Amino acid sequence: MASQPEYENWQQLMDLVKTAVEKDQHELLLTMMMTPDERDALVARINIFCELMKGEMSQRQVSQMLGVGVATITRGSNELKAKSEQEKAVIADLLLKQ
């Protein structure tokens, strides 16, 4: 019986996801790790970041469009504000369809 969990920190989880991507098994892994509600919440979070980065709608409008609370939008906004301009550029490149 193991006395320690296999995965103890965020970096180990990121390494696991990277390995799954390299083996083209990421969909199986991520689907197993999250319930349908958690997957929906993650999709909403990604859309929050997309809309905040576009800057075309108010937080209230984003909230209404995505069906999430304004506090959820605010938390996403605060996370985005904490990133450097370089990090924001990388995130925009990943998320925004040009």
From Swiss-Prot:
Tell me the GO molecular function terms: DNA-binding transcription factor activity; sequence-specific DNA binding
Q: Name one GO cellular component term.
A: cytoplasm
**Any one of the GO BP annotations:** negative regulation of DNA-templated transcription
Q: Which residues bind DNA?
A: 59-82
NCBIfam families from the UniProt entry: TrpR (TIGR01321)
Q: What's this protein's family per the entry?
A: Belongs to the TrpR family.
Cite the HAMAP family for this sequence: Trp_repressor
Task: State the name under which the record lists this protein.
Answer: Trp operon repressor homolog
Q: Which organism is it from?
A: Vibrio atlanticus (strain LGP32)
The uppermost taxa in this organism's lineage are: Bacteria, Pseudomonadati, Pseudomonadota, Gammaproteobacteria, Vibrionales
